[in-house]
């Protein structure tokens, strides 16, 4: 997009409303997108909170004797196969997140010689899965990739945040 066009668009945005409350960014095709600054900050805080809770869940699983690793694959429901997860990135600066697979973690625990429990763990602060996430969980369980899938949910006890694990089979596959 030409510099004159960007200036003209920015001028029109300023004329239309309060430009101090909005931030305009440009996508790959040069199309402007305006966002409220308050919502940008709220998204940043939510991502940071989610990342902190993810670390807490990982530490908790490791304390319970499981070997935990970030799951870097996803399910393509149309093809019915596992595919590498796509990276999320900001085209103007850097890679934002690398591990965007579903579920978040794979946790392995040795039961006895030659037998292991392999579970998938999806971390959600509110414990709610979308319809697509539920379909992916069902697919993983039907194909026998994971023996169980747990949903790690944040539970408040006063100021302290605890972790509650919900078994996907028990809650959704009755």
Predicted stretch roles:
Residues 46, 71-112:
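Active-site metal-binding core of divalent-cation-utilizing nuclease and nuclease-like domains
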Residues 69, 121, 150-152:
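Hydrophobic/aromatic beta-strand patches that form the interior of the parallel beta-sheet core
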Residues 75, 127, 156-158:
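Residue-level detector of flexible, active-site-proximal loop/helix-junction positions
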Residues 44, 48-58, 131-174:
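Domain-level recognition of nuclease-like catalytic cores that cleave nucleotide substrates
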Residues 96-99, 114-119, 126-138:
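Active-site-adjacent loop/helix micro-motif of nuclease/hydrolase catalytic cores
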Residues 72, 124, 153-155:
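Residues at the C-termini of beta-strands that transition into short coil/loop
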Residues 61, 104-109, 114-127:
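Conserved catalytic cores of phosphodiester-cleaving nucleases, focusing on short active-site segments
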Residues 1-85:
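Interdomain/boundary linker segments immediately adjacent to catalytic/signaling cores
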């Amino acid at each position: 997009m030409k510099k004159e066009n960007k200036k003209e668009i920015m001028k029109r945005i300023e004329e239309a409303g309060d430009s101090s409350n909005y931030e305009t960014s440009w996508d790959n095709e040069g199309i402007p997108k305006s966002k409220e600054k308050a919502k940008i900050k709220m998204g940043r805080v939510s991502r940071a909170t989610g990342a902190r809770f993810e670390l807490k869940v990982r530490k908790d699983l490791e304390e319970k004797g499981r070997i935990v690793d970030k799951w870097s694959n996803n399910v393509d429901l149309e093809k019915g196969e596992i595919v590498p997860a796509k990276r999320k990135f900001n085209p103007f600066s850097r890679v934002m997140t690398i591990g965007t697979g579903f579920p978040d973690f794979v946790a392995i625990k040795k039961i006895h010689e030659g037998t292991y429990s392999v579970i998938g763990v999806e971390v959600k602060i509110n414990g709610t899965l979308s319809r697509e996430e539920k379909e992916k969980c069902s697919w993983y369980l039907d194909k026998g990739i994971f023996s169980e899938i747990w949903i790690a949910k944040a539970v408040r006890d006063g100021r302290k945040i605890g972790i509650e694990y919900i078994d996907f089979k028990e809650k959704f596959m009755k």
